[in-house]
Amino acid sequence: MSNFAGDETAPFFGFLGAAAALVFSCMGAAYGTAKSGVGVASMGVMRPELVMKSIVPVVMAGVLGIYGLIIAVIISTGINPKTKSYYLFDGYAHLSSGLACGLAGLSAGMAIGIVGDAGVRANAQQPKLFVGMILILIFAEALALYGLIVGIILSSRAGQSRAE
C-alpha cells in the first residue's frame, strides 16, 4: 500500500504526459530542422549569399522543442504526491496536457519542415517568394502555440477535482 493519499497509478499518467510533451514536440522540432536544413544546404550550393536568410525555418522548427519543455516542466512540478494528494483526474489532466502540446508540436514541425524545404529552394530561384514562405511558416508555428496554450489550460485543471 502506498503512503500517500490519492491513487497509486495517477503519477504514472502525469509523468507520461510530461514525457509525451517533450518527446513529441522534440520529434517535430527534429523533423522540421532536418527537413528544412536539407533544403538550406541544397539551396546554398546554388545561392550561397541566401543561406543566412534561409535559416528561418530551421530556427522556427527548433523553437517547437521549447514548447514541449515548458509543458513538461509545468507538469512535473505539479506532481508531488508526498505533499498533496494526486488523483487520477490530475494524472489524466497532465496526460492530456502533454499529448495536446506534444502532438501539436509534432504536426507543426512536420509542416515547418516541408514548407521550409520547398520554400528555401523556391526562394533561391524566385526571391519574391520569401515573404509568402515566412507567412506560411508563421501559421504552422501557430499550430504549436495553440497546443501550448491548451496544454497550459489543461495542466492548470489538475487539482480541481476536489475541495481541499
From Swiss-Prot:
It comes from the Eukaryota. InterPro entries: ATPase_proteolipid_c-like_dom, ATPase_proteolipid_csu, ATPase_proteolipid_su_C_euk, F/V-ATP_Csub_sf. Pfam families: ATP-synt_C. GO terms for molecular function: proton-transporting ATPase activity, rotational mechanism. Belongs to the V-ATPase proteolipid subunit family. The record marks E141 as: Essential for proton translocation. It is found in: Vacuole membrane. Residues 33-54, 117-128 are cytoplasmic. It is a multi-pass membrane protein. This is V-type proton ATPase 16 kDa proteolipid subunit. V-ATPase is a heteromultimeric enzyme composed of a peripheral catalytic V1 complex (main components: subunits A, B, C, D, E, and F) attached to an integral membrane V0 proton pore complex (main component: the proteolipid protein; which is present as a hexamer that forms the proton-conducting pore). GO terms for cellular component: membrane; proton-transporting V-type ATPase, V0 domain; vacuolar membrane. Its main location: membrane. Residues 1-9, 76-94, 155-164 are lumenal. Keywords: Hydrogen ion transport, Ion transport, Membrane, Transmembrane, Transmembrane helix, Transport, Vacuole. Proton-conducting pore forming subunit of the membrane integral V0 complex of vacuolar ATPase. V-ATPase is responsible for acidifying a variety of intracellular compartments in eukaryotic cells. The chain crosses the membrane at residues 10-32, 55-75, 95-116, 129-154.
